[in-house]
């Protein structure tokens, strides 16, 4: 969550669009706000802001408590087993760290929405909190893409070099994702400022003369990097993996194929509504013209859509960890480890393989070394069930500037 999309020259709450000819006489934000103050409403939508704040407060609080517990458990269990980490554990561990970062930012967004976007935590935290959120949002999505690609490559690759260097590749990919995610938000964050007033607000404040261009560039980059590029990759590689695993007449195979399709469906349900709303509000007034009732509804429900997009940090631990019997075994071992010694025997695993934390869909090669006579050995597959969902709260569009 962050600053809401700017209405630019379009209508905000109870305000009509201003003719373009009138905007030619406007030279700064103060004059623009003054013009909107004297513009009459053409339509009015009766919506309860107080009810929305209560609902959002409850949702944010629930996501914070559940997400904090889930992601801490995932990190602890995977960290303890990092020495003998499974096929996808490095990506899962990093994704849990990114999701935990989003969860830790939820109290700030919860209070900001409750206080009607009044920012009480100073100028530094205004920028840092948004930057911290964006970094973790992009990281979570990118690690999800890597999981989808790596799963298919591991399933289909018989190359000895891949078997030898796959862990190095994964470490390099994880480091690269964190660096890339730290760079991507910078153009937006440098324009986020604390606007002082009776009720200080944390807003996206690009130069007035190029504000519409900046707002559109930020919205497009968010949608492209956060959805339009990850979505095809996640879809294609999960579908290819499902086709590879499909075995007619095998109920377990069908279940795992449906699970792979569920990964894609959850990602779409989390992020598509957010990015559609973000683009519509950003384009309105400058590139497209929306009916004022629709604009009112989009602004009103933007906070709710933004909140639901953050559900990925609560659902990811369930889909990629808790639905896996292997993870539950490791979690039980971790709990038993801290119990009195005379109670630990009942919780120990029969073998190390049964305790290893793996992705809900586990892909292993039949032989560690490819046979000379069989350059393309058939993979041996074992599965555990689970679901998916991506990030972020989303990168919020620029907030409508409504006078106090």
Swiss-Prot record:
One of its GO terms (cellular component) is plasma membrane. Highly expressed in heart, skeletal muscle, immune system, adrenal gland and liver. The keyword Disulfide bond applies. GO terms for biological process: cell surface receptor signaling pathway. Disulfide bonds join 126-202. It comes from the Eukaryota. InterPro entries: G10D_rcpt (IPR001350), GPCR_Rhodpsn (IPR000276), GPCR_Rhodpsn_7TM (IPR017452), GPER1-like (IPR047143). Residues 80-90, 150-170, 240-258, 321-404 are cytoplasmic. SUPFAM superfamilies: Family A G protein-coupled receptor-like (SSF81321). It holds the Pfam family 7tm_1. GO terms for molecular function: G protein-coupled receptor activity; transmembrane signaling receptor activity. Glycans are attached at residues 28, 37. Keywords: Cell membrane, Disulfide bond, G-protein coupled receptor, Glycoprotein, Membrane, Receptor, Transducer, Transmembrane, Transmembrane helix. Residues 1-57, 114-127, 194-217, 281-299 are extracellular. The chain crosses the membrane at residues 58-79, 91-113, 128-149, 171-193, 218-239, 259-280, 300-320. Its main location: membrane. It is found in: Cell membrane. It is a multi-pass membrane protein. PANTHER family: G-PROTEIN COUPLED RECEPTOR 182 (PTHR24226:SF0), G-PROTEIN COUPLED RECEPTOR 182 AND ESTROGEN RECEPTOR 1 (PTHR24226). Belongs to the G-protein coupled receptor 1 family. Orphan receptor. This is G-protein coupled receptor 182. It comes from Homo sapiens. The lineage of its organism: Eukaryota, Metazoa, Chordata, Craniata, Vertebrata.
């Amino acid at each position: 969550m962050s600053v809401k999309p700017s209405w630019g020259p379009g209508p905000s709450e109870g305000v009509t669009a201003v003719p373009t000819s009138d905007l030619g006489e406007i030279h700064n934000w103060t004059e623009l706000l003054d013009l909107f103050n004297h513009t009459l409403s053409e339509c009015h939508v009766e919506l309860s802001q107080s009810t929305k704040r209560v609902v959002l407060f409850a949702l944010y609080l629930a996501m914070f408590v559940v997400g904090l517990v889930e992601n801490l458990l995932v990190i602890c269990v995977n960290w303890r087993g990092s020495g003998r980490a499974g096929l996808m554990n490095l990506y899962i561990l990093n994704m849990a760290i990114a999701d935990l970062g989003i969860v830790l930012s939820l109290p700030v967004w919860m209070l900001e929405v409750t206080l009607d976007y009044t920012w009480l935590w100073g100028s530094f935290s205004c920028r840092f909190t948004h930057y911290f959120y964006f970094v973790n949002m992009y990281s979570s999505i990118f690690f999800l893409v890597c999981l989808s690609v790596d799963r298919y490559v591991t399933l289909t690759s018989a190359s000895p070099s891949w078997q030898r260097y796959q862990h190095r590749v994964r470490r390099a990919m994880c480091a690269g994702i964190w660096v890339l995610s730290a760079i991507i938000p910078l153009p937006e964050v440098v324009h986020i400022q604390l606007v002082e007033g009776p009720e200080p607000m944390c807003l996206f404040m690009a130069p007035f003369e190029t504000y519409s261009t900046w707002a559109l560039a930020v919205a497009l980059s968010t949608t492209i990097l956060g959805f339009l590029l990850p979505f095809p990759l996640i879809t294609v590689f999960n579908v290819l993996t499902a086709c590879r695993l499909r075995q007619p007449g095998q109920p377990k195979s069908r279940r795992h194929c449906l699970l792979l399709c569920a990964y894609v469906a959850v990602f779409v349900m989390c992020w598509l509504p957010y990015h559609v709303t973000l683009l519509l509000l950003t384009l309105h007034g400058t590139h497209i013209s929306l009916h004022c009732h629709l604009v009112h509804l989009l602004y009103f429900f933007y906070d709710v859509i933004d909140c639901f997009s953050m559900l990925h940090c609560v659902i990811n631990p369930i889909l990629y960890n808790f639905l896996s019997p292997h993870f539950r075994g490791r979690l039980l071992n971790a709990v038993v480890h801290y119990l009195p010694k005379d109670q630990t025997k009942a919780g120990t695993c029969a073998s190390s393989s049964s305790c290893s934390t793996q992705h809900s869909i586990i892909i292993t090669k039949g032989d560690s070394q490819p046979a000379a006579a069989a350059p393309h050995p058939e993979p041996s597959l074992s599965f555990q069930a689970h679901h998916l969902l991506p990030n972020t709260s989303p990168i919020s569009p620029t907030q409508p500037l409504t006078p106090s």
